[in-house]
């Protein structure tokens, strides 16, 4: 069965709560009060937005998550939609709408403005009417609500102004007409976002790089996940002192880099790559000393025969299929030289 075509600018659409969205919230290690504050803010909009819209200080249902890359903002935003949907499940389903802001800029004068107006005035209201609750996730929102005061050096500052004006107008209209719609946005560059957009936010939450204790918790969580597939790894996840020592080697890393350290550890030795159950802390420490996956090539590597010996003929494949004409031409050219 063919998947339905999504409207322009819509990256994905999900109906929540759904089991396959459960992991995102727990995957990001942040203080408990951070998650509680985010969930509380989401419920205020999704559950009480219509009543609160009668107040003089109109809520905009807008949350901005700001911080360096790899700090878990987007994953946490998706997880927030799921846990909010779980909290509101008795009152009806929730739609999670992910927007691709990079689809809106256009070289044609005024086209960016029209695209944004179409999204905010037509697409989102139409989708929001389907279910009681709607969460709209906009990643890298700085490309959607460009800071107008810095647009004088842009190729087309007039269009930037018009597009950002359209964002403000659309956000205001949705806040008035659909006050139970929650916008969760993320940015790596908060100074690139228009001041008027930020002033409309009900919550701006800044994320920093993880401290040593948080890094240790991320490492432990990652090892526990690995142990689900290879139970022999579980003792590593329980060795708190070793984990804390490893965390000290990861100072200044973001959460994504810390999680990828486990993958880098698996790739330090061929024995471990073949059988991850043989993973040792020394593999992880070696990977950490090399800054995860960032390494310089050293001496000449051994040949494949030195590594694996002769491969039996019955395991080898013919070399006479699976290539296009260019491949044949390349080999003919080499033979002629």
Q: What is the predicted function of each stretch?
A:
Residues 1-25, 212-337:
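C-terminal alpha-helical "lid" subdomain
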Residues 20-61:
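Pre-Walker A (pre-P-loop) alpha-helix and adjacent loop at the N terminus of AAA/AAA+ ATPase modules
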Residues 59-97, 122:
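Walker A/P-loop
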Residues 93-128:
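Short glycine-rich substrate-engagement loop in P-loop NTPases that contacts/grips substrate
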Residues 114-119, 149-177:
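Substrate-gripping "pore-loop 1 plus following alpha2 helix"
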Residues 128-152:
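Conserved P-loop NTPase "ATPase switch" module shared by AAA+ and STAND
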Residues 137, 165-169, 180-187:
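Structural recognition of the conserved hydrophobic beta-strand(s) that form the central parallel beta-sheet
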Residues 195-209:
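A short helix-turn-beta junction within AAA+ P-loop NTPase domains corresponding to the substrate/partner-engaging
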């Amino acid at each position: 069965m063919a998947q339905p075509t999504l409207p322009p600018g819509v990256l994905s659409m999900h109906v929540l709560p759904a089991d396959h969205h459960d992991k995102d919230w727990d995957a990001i290690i942040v203080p408990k009060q951070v998650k509680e504050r985010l969930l509380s803010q989401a419920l205020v909009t999704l559950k009480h937005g219509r009543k609160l819209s009668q107040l003089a200080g109109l809520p905009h249902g807008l949350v901005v998550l700001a911080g360096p890359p790899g700090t878990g903002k987007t994953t946490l935003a998706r997880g927030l939609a799921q846990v909010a949907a779980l909290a509101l499940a008795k009152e009806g389903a929730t739609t999670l709408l992910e927007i691709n802001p990079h689809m809106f800029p256009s070289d044609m004068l005024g086209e960016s403005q029209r695209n944004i107006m179409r999204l905010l005035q037509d697409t989102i209201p139409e989708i929001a009417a389907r279910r009681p609750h709607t969460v709209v996730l906009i990643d890298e929102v700085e490309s959607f609500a460009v800071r107008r005061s810095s647009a004088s050096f842009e190729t087309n500052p007039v269009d930037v102004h018009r597009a950002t004006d359209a964002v403000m107008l659309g956000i205001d209209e949705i806040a008035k007409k659909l006050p139970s719609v929650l916008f969760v946005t993320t940015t790596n560059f908060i100074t690139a976002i228009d001041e008027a957009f930020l002033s409309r936010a009900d919550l701006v939450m800044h994320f920093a790089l993880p401290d040593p204790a948080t890094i240790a918790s991320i490492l432990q969580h990652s090892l526990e996940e690995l142990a689900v597939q290879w139970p022999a790894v579980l003792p590593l996840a329980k060795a708190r002192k070793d984990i804390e020592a490893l965390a000290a080697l990861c100072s200044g890393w973001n959460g994504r880099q810390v999680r990828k350290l486990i993958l880098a550890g698996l790739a330090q030795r061929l024995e471990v790559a073949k059988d991850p159950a043989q993973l040792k802390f020394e593999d992880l420490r070696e990977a950490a000393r090399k800054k995860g996956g960032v390494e310089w090539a050293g001496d000449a590597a051994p040949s494949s025969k030195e590594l694996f010996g002769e491969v039996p003929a019955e395991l080898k494949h013919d070399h006479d299929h699976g290539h296009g004409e260019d491949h044949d031409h390349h080999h003919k050219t080499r033979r002629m030289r």
